[in-house]
Amino acid sequence: MIKLVVLSVGFLSAGDLLANTPEQVVTAFQRDYKYWNDQSFQKNQNDGKQEVMLQAQKGWNELLKKYTKPGFQGEPIAFGSESSHDPEQEKIISVQITEKIAVVTTKFSRQYYSPTYEYQLSKENDTWYLSQIFLVDDDGKYPSL
């Protein structure tokens, strides 16, 4: 019963965020992303695949609605046994802010692979929105939002 209640609440809108800085938005996104990933992966292990993918896409759309400007089109969904974002393991290593644009760089510490992410944000009406997240490696930057 509790599981159903939590899932029916969904995600709050960007205006409901208690995040006033780019760093706070990034950390909140990491937390919500990890929750979405873990729920989607667990359901994928237990339920029918097509229904799970529809629910995962719905959850992803809610995440995008919460953290991006209206009309943003994200990348195809991807979830797995280990979340790509987790505020307990992915640490902010730099923040650059110039008026209404911010770049927050993070490092995700893992045993065999420690990816770097670059969160790009823009500010509109006193609210910071994600505009893209790039996975950064030696070969370039790859959009992942």
Give, region by region, the residue ranges found by the protein language model.
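A structured, charge-rich N-terminal accessory region that forms the first stable segment of a protein
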Residues: S40-W60
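Absolute protein N-terminus
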Residues: M1, L18-N20
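Sec-dependent signal peptide recognition
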Residues: M1-L7
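Short, aromatic-enriched amphipathic alpha-helices that serve as compact interaction elements
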Residues: N20-S40
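Surface-exposed, charged secondary-structure patches
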Residues: A56-Y112
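Short beta-strand edge/turn micro-motifs at domain boundaries
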Residues: S114-S144
